[in-house]
Structure formats: C-alpha cells, structure tokens
Swiss-Prot record:
GO molecular function: protein homodimerization activity
Protein name: Myomesin-1
Localisation: Cytoplasm, Myofibril, Sarcomere, M line
Annotated spans, Disordered: 177-212
SS bond partners: none
Tissue note: Seems to be expressed in all cardiac and skeletal fibers.
Length: 340
C-alpha cells in the first residue's frame, strides 16, 4: 500500500510538472505572438480609464473580488460582471450575465518641441526643431501610393558622398552609377584659396604670399601649401583640411596623391615629394577639402584661379604653375542649386 501511495504521489508530481511546463510554453507562445503583432503595427497611444462606474457609482474591484473584472487590451476596455448568488461547497462556473458596451478611444496626440523652456516650431511635422546648417539633417519619408496591401515596416535611406578625397575610407567606395549621379549635381562657388611657397608663411595665408618666394634656395622635394579659411561655410564649423595634389608633365597627368591622411588644422601644410627633377615645366594641381563637424562635405566647388611658385636649381630652372585649386565646404543642396 505504501508503494502504491508513493507511485501515486510521483504520478501527481509528474502531472503537475507537465501541466506547469505546458502553461509556460503557452504563455511564451502567447507573448511571442503578441510581440510579433506589436512589430506589425505602428505604436498607438492608449488611454486607460481611471475608474469604472455602475449606476453612477464607482466600482471597487477589491471590495468584491471575482465579481468585477476590468481588462484593457489593444485599446479596447471591457468590464465583466459575474452574478453568482448561489452558495454551495462545490465549484461552479457561471457565465457572466452582463457585459459593458465595447468602446474605443481615437485621438491624435499633439507634439510640441521646446528649447530652454520656450516652444518652437518644428521644421518637419512630428520632428524636433533644429537650427539650420547643423551637423545633422531631418529626412521625412512618404508612404507609397500602392503598397499591395502589405504593412510597411520601415524605410531604407541611401546616402552617398561626392568626389571622395579619402579613398581609403570604406564609406567613400561608391559604384560608378553613384559617382555619375553625384557628379551631375550643381557646383557651389569657390570659397577658399591654396597658396604654394618654399617657406613657411610668416603672416596669414593669402594671395600675397604667392609672390613672396625665395628663388635663391635650391629645388626642394617639398612645397608648403598655405590654406585660407573659406568665407562661406554654411554655418558649419571647419575642423581641418585634406590636401591632395597631382603632377602633370608634358600634358600627361600623373596619379593623384594624398598629402595628408589625417585632417590638418594649421594655416600651412608641407607637401612632401611635391617636386620632381625632370626637364620641362611640371604643372602641379592642388585640391583642398575642408572637413566640417558633420564629416566630409558632399558638394564640390568649382575650380577657379591660378597661382605661380618659382624655384631655382643650379643646373635646372623652371616654374611650378598651380593650374587650379578647389576648396570644398558644407553647403546644403538647396542653396547649391540656387547659387549655380
């Protein structure tokens, strides 16, 4: 008899474990489905009623446990009243005698942005207001007219940069179609200068430094590129410059070289191996790109102006002509169209 009782207890315990395991699995499946349903719909604000009333009298759920059941799910609020007046020792399950009417609340929330306690107008509906020419922008997406009835879960935004000067960076690796599309954008006006000298400029970089070149020194394997800060930057702060140059000998352009890999903030930068000891006047094209706080600029400026830096060697005399220069600054695309 004791063995039979022990087997019964083990059977009951195993049944309880199986029942608990089944309950946990059902609960997990329910929450998983609930999460998937959450992801398929846009979040909606829900207002839950503070108090339920019956015959103009507030209902106290704690005072009558089991009689009143108030639930709020998916924006639908229900009140269930169980009328159980019979008393007996057995358990009884009675259907509810009355249900409160189903109702839903629909409203449009109002979003208001503040700065320093003062309300401000947002540039795009539902987005925080920001000052112009900041280091980030707000992109709004419109729902397509025909979507086949399928729910839209999100949007993908493609971003590209034009005329990359840092080829080593992965973000600058664009396909030919992207490069062709970016090259077709309108150009912004030139906003800076590059001056090449054989000495460190003693004063602020400017066009007058191009005329002050020491012709008594022998030809060096480097040049000093002086950079003047652009006058128009679109309100963005310049944090440094990238200098690229290319040698053109007898009309044949050489490969473009990067003078610096890291952005420099000095007014002049020494470009190593910028001259070559070959007959003929080598032309040297410099390109300068300004880096702003938001990263590299994506609007290429037009080429404008010519500068001349002359050198003298014991056995060779020639002039190094700076055929053109470019300075890129951050200018919004809308302003670039209006200026072009």
């Amino acid at each position: 008899q004791s063995m039979s009782t022990l087997h019964q207890e083990e059977a009951f315990e195993k049944a309880d474990q199986l029942s608990l395991k089944k309950t946990l699995e059902e609960t997990e499946a329910f929450h998983k489905k609930l999460n998937e349903d959450h992801l398929l719909h846009a979040p909606e604000p829900v207002i839950k009623p503070g108090t339920a009333y019956k015959n103009q009298v507030p209902i106290n759920v704690q005072a009558h446990p089991g009689k009143y059941i108030i639930e709020s799910r998916y924006g639908v609020h229900t009140l269930e009243i169980n009328d159980d007046t019979r008393f007996h020792s057995g358990a009884s399950t009675l259907p509810p005698s009355x249900y409160a009417s189903r109702f839903e609340i629909h409203f449009q929330p109002e979003i208001q942005x503040y700065r320093n306690g003062v309300p401000i107008d947002a540039e795009x509906x539902g987005a925080p207001a920001i000052p112009k020419y900041n280091d980030y922008i707000i992109i709004t997406x419109k729902q397509p007219a025909v979507d086949g009835g399928s729910p839209i879960l999100g949007y993908f935004i493609d971003v590209g940069i034009g005329x990359p000067s840092r080829v080593s960076e992965p973000v600058a690796a664009l396909d030919p179609a992207e490069k062709a599309r970016l090259k077709s954008r309108p150009s912004a006006p030139x906003t800076g200068q590059i001056i090449v000298t054989e000495e460190e400029p003693s004063e602020e970089a400017g066009t007058e430094n191009x005329q002050r070149v020491n012709t008594e020194l022998p030809v060096k394997x480097s040049n000093n590129a002086g950079v003047x800060e652009p006058e128009e930057t679109g309100g963005a702060e310049i944090t440094g410059y990238y200098v690229n140059y290319r040698e053109v000998i007898d009309g044949v352009p050489g490969r473009x070289r990067e003078a610096n890999i890291k952005a420099i903030s000095d007014e002049a930068y020494k470009x190593e191996e910028x001259t070559i000891a070959v007959p003929g006047p080598p032309h040297m094209t410099f390109k300068n790109r300004a880096r702003v706080v938001g990263g590299l600029p994506d609007v290429v400026t037009i080429q404008e102006g010519k500068l001349l830096a002359s050198d003298e060697h014991x056995n060779l005399k020639y002039g190094s002509e700076i055929s053109d220069f470019t300075v890129s600054v951050f200018i919004p695309e809308e302003e670039a169209r209006s200026v072009a």
